[in-house]
Each structure stands twice: as structure tokens, then as C-alpha cells.
Amino acid sequence: MMSGTADLAGVYAAVEESAGLLDVSCAREKVWPILAAFEDVLPTAVIAFRVATNARHEGEFDCRFTVPGSIDPYAVALDKGLTHRSGHPIETLVADVQKHCAVDSYGVDFGVVGGFKKIWVYFPGGRHESLAHLGEIPSMPPGLAATEGFFARYGLADKVDLIGVDYASKTMNVYFAASPEVVSAPTVLAMHREIGLPDPSEQMLDFCSRAFGVYTTLNWDSSKVERIAYSVKTEDPLELSARLGSKVEQFLKSVPYGIDTPKMVYAAVTAGGEEYYKLQSYYQWRTDSRLNLSYIGGRS
């Protein structure tokens, strides 16, 4: 679907239909208020749908869309009652980042069951942030500064492309642009072993070698890295060496949107050794979006 054609009812119908392909019921009372709150940006937004293969995401279907840098998505979410303050440092993080860093644009993520979940903060294309600079922000998770040396050893500490703020799980993702060397099998194994994560399977190592980006998950209760995940852009996810599972494969074959647009596949290993994948397909795509610059810049 081309940009400029999104409308509230049309987007909602597409979300509901796509979730139904996975036998997930769309909770209108959760989804409609989010779309309505950002109705003005939907016609020009990148709009994506995401499914995951792990048990934690069973019964959920995630959607996300981009928001221009001139709009503060957290302020909108608060104003429209999509989220509420509880006194956690995560609630000031987006505002603190705005004060310390140049911001290009944002993304908003929600589940059709769980409602509002995340905000992404994209830094300007070609102007990566560093962990050292981000670590000066008082509301950042303590693990950011604690793991700076680890990521510096692998050439990632000054390659931060964006961050993801997860209000539902009280975690933060840091997304790095990765060179081919960083996602090679020896380096991936070394990173996992250094922080005590299980070795990926041979299948996953092959997948990782195609990645343009790496991201890590941090929280405010620990200085440890929760996980490391790898991002691959592909035209045909079924050709990847990834265990997408029958439901996700059926979704790929059945979803009527984004047939000719790129797909994103993410892979991760949990601390318990579970390997899982997330597939992201696009209802509405824009080649000039900051999102596409991330793909291009990740391997430049």
C-alpha cells in the first residue's frame, strides 16, 4: 500500500484482518484509541506488523508506525490516556533524550491485546550516538554505562542508531549499526560467551552473518545485558535459515499487505537458551523513511 492512503478505519481493518491470520483477536478498545491519537501522522507513516515465534508473545500481534520528530509521542500518549505515570525513571527517558541528543523521528508500538507498549527514538541518519554520551542522561538504565566497555571491545559503542523504550516491560533496547565483522560467527560466539549467553545454533549463526544491525536489551534493575538480537532485511524470509514456525510461515503466505516491500527478521537467544525469531512486514512502506536509512547505513 502506498503512502498517503492510510485512514483510521482502513488501518484498523488491516490490523484486525492481519491479527486474525494468527487467530489473535483484536481488542478494539485498546487499538482504536492509539490509532485515533496519531491519526494525523498515519497517512505518511511507515506502518508495520510484527509476529514472534516464542511462547511469551503467543496470543499477541504487534503493530508499529513512525512519527515525525516534531511530535512528542510520549506526551501524546499521556494526554490521550494511553499510558500513565508511576514514578519509574523510564517515564522521563524520552524527554531527557530530547534534551541531550538530536532526534530525527520516532516510532510507536502497540499490541492488539496489550495496547500501547513502546516508543522508538531515531537519531539522525549518519550521525550515530555513543554509549558514553547516552550514559550521561540520568534516567538511562545503569546497565548502559556498565556495558560500555563490552560494546566498545566489539566496535559498537559509538554506533547507536536508535533506542527503543518499552513501557510495558520497563526495559530499553539499544540498536547498533553493525559491520560484517561484528556479525561473523566468531564474533557472535565471543560476545555471547563474554556475557554468559548460550551459544547460538549453527542455523542462527548463519542467520546472524546476514545482519545489518545488533540490539541489546537493558533494564533498571540490573547492570547485565538481558539479550542480544540480530536484524536482517530480506525480500523473502522463507529463504532464511530461520525457524519461523508454521503459524508465521502461514502468515507470510496469507497476509495481503506489503507483498512487494522488504521484510525484517530479528533473531535472539534468551539467557535460558531459547532461540526465537520475530518477523516484521509492512502495511505501508516509504523508501525515504529514516527506517530505510537504518537498513542502508547498517552495512555502509
Curated annotation (Swiss-Prot):
Gene transcribed to yield this protein? fnq26
- The Enzyme Commission number assigned here is 2.5.1.123
Q: Which InterPro entries match?
A: Aro_prenylTrfase, Prenyltransferase_CloQ, PrenylTrfase-like_sf
- Into which family does the record put it? Belongs to the aromatic prenyltransferase family.
Activity regulation summary: Does not require magnesium or any other divalent metal ions for activity.
Regions that span the bilayer: none
Sorted keywords for this record are: Prenyltransferase, Transferase
Briefly explain the null phenotype. Answer: Mutant still produces endophenazine A, but does not produce FNQ I.
Function, as annotated, reads:
Involved in the biosynthesis of furanonaphthoquinone I (FNQ I). Catalyzes C- and O-prenylations of different phenolic substrates. With 1,3-dihydroxynaphthalene and 4-hydroxybenzoate as substrates, catalyzes O-prenylations.
| Catalysed reactions, semicolon-separated | flaviolin + (2E)-geranyl diphosphate = 3-linalylflaviolin + diphosphate
Which top-level group of life is the source organism from? Bacteria
Q: How does it assemble?
A: Monomer.
Name of the molecule in the record: Flaviolin linalyltransferase
